[in-house]
């Protein structure tokens, strides 16, 4: 039976549960449950702390896991990404007191507080910088005010928390993170339950990033319309009662789909409809 780790709480938890549910897997009914057995799909789910998931997967105790790219990278565990899941996006950056034009090189000789010490040490080593890394389990922003650190490295979303503590982010992102599906590096690839879960989740993620466009199109502009909506292999064409018109159906990326609809309307297409897709296979 396939053994899969899922975040038990935090920003990744609900999105991970939603994707697995959409993919046809059982959800836990009580937030206190640590395991859920899904015999129909030959899977057992284990609900763990997000930062521990890569350790369990890397050790081979669990087959797959959903966690953050930043957490997996900081763990140092021998895991590989199978899928990017498109949720929980954030950047991991250095920050220091506002009022100075900071550069990463300014960190040399300073104390840096972070909850991701391995990511920070690797980045400093790659840059040839010598700084003291102080590991904290949370609320690293307050460490400068308390005199524990001179700068921090932390996950940055809107930047509101940094501004509240009069801090400013600087330098490039150390890690652009999001939810990812991981497995142990070098793990066997021939488990049917494993492959089924990966393909189901891949189909859900793809569906969340695309939608279906339907429209009626005069044959005189069909070639130009198809260039705007080429679909995956090619668009579906269906004859209408009027022989001079056809119905067109094609999948397009959600990003920019309104511009595509505008362009089709300007070209002369009619009854242009966009609809969501729940899941996809064989793409």
UniProtKB/Swiss-Prot annotation:
<dbReference type="Pfam" id="PF08029">
    <property type="entry name" value="HisG_C"/>
</dbReference>
<dbReference type="Pfam" id="PF01634">
    <property type="entry name" value="HisG"/>
</dbReference>
<keyword id="KW-0028">Amino-acid biosynthesis</keyword>
<keyword id="KW-0460">Magnesium</keyword>
<dbReference type="InterPro" id="IPR013115">
    <property type="entry name" value="HisG_C"/>
</dbReference>
<dbReference type="InterPro" id="IPR013820">
    <property type="entry name" value="ATP_PRibTrfase_cat"/>
</dbReference>
<dbReference type="GO" id="GO:0003879">
    <property type="term" value="F:ATP phosphoribosyltransferase activity"/>
</dbReference>
<dbReference type="InterPro" id="IPR001348">
    <property type="entry name" value="ATP_PRibTrfase_HisG"/>
</dbReference>
<keyword id="KW-0067">ATP-binding</keyword>
<comment type="pathway">
    <text>Amino-acid biosynthesis; L-histidine biosynthesis; L-histidine from 5-phospho-alpha-D-ribose 1-diphosphate: step 1/9.</text>
</comment>
<dbReference type="GO" id="GO:0005737">
    <property type="term" value="C:cytoplasm"/>
</dbReference>
<keyword id="KW-0368">Histidine biosynthesis</keyword>
<keyword id="KW-0328">Glycosyltransferase</keyword>
<dbReference type="InterPro" id="IPR018198">
    <property type="entry name" value="ATP_PRibTrfase_CS"/>
</dbReference>
<comment type="function">
    <text>Catalyzes the condensation of ATP and 5-phosphoribose 1-diphosphate to form N'-(5'-phosphoribosyl)-ATP (PR-ATP). Has a crucial role in the pathway because the rate of histidine biosynthesis seems to be controlled primarily by regulation of HisG enzymatic activity.</text>
</comment>
<dbReference type="InterPro" id="IPR020621">
    <property type="entry name" value="ATP-PRT_HisG_long"/>
</dbReference>
<dbReference type="InterPro" id="IPR015867">
    <property type="entry name" value="N-reg_PII/ATP_PRibTrfase_C"/>
</dbReference>
<comment type="similarity">
    <text>Belongs to the ATP phosphoribosyltransferase family. Long subfamily.</text>
</comment>
<dbReference type="GO" id="GO:0000287">
    <property type="term" value="F:magnesium ion binding"/>
</dbReference>
<keyword id="KW-0547">Nucleotide-binding</keyword>
<dbReference type="InterPro" id="IPR011322">
    <property type="entry name" value="N-reg_PII-like_a/b"/>
</dbReference>
<keyword id="KW-0479">Metal-binding</keyword>
<dbReference type="GO" id="GO:0005524">
    <property type="term" value="F:ATP binding"/>
</dbReference>
<keyword id="KW-0808">Transferase</keyword>
<keyword id="KW-0963">Cytoplasm</keyword>
<dbReference type="GO" id="GO:0000105">
    <property type="term" value="P:L-histidine biosynthetic process"/>
</dbReference>
<protein>
    <recommendedName>
        <fullName>ATP phosphoribosyltransferase</fullName>
        <ecNumber>2.4.2.17</ecNumber>
    </recommendedName>
</protein>
């Amino acid at each position: 039976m396939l053994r899969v780790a899922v975040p038990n709480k935090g920003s990744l938890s609900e999105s991970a549960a939603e994707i697995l549910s959409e993919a046809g897997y059982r959800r836990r009914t009580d937030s206190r449950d640590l395991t859920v057995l899904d015999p129909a799909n030959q899977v057992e789910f284990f609900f763990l702390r997000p930062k521990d998931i890569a350790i369990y997967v890397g050790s081979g105790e669990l087959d797959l896991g959903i966690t953050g790219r930043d957490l997996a990278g900081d763990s140092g565990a021998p895991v590989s990404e199978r899928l990017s899941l498109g949720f929980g996006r954030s950047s991991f950056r250095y920050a220091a007191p506002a009022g100075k034009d900071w550069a990463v090189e300014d960190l040399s000789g300073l104390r840096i507080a972070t909850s991701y010490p391995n990511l920070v040490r690797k980045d400093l080593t790659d840059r040839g910088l010598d700084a003291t890394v102080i590991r904290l389990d949370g609320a690293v922003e307050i460490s400068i005010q308390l005199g524990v650190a001179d700068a921090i490295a932390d996950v940055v979303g809107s930047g509101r928390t940094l501004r509240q503590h009069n801090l400013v982010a600087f330098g490039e992102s150390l890690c652009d993170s999001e939810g990812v599906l991981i497995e142990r590096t070098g793990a066997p690839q021939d488990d049917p339950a494993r492959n089924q879960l990966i393909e189901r989740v891949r189909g859900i993620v793809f569906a969340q990033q695309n939608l279906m466009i339907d429209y009626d199109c005069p044959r005189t502009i069909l070639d130009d319309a198809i260039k705007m909506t080429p679909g995956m292999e090619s668009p579906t064409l269906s004859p209408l009662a009027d022989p001079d018109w056809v119905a067109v159906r094609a999948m397009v990326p959600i990003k920019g789909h309104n511009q595509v609809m505008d362009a089709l309307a300007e070209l002369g297409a009619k009854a242009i409809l966009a609809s969501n897709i729940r899941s996809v296979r064989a793409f």
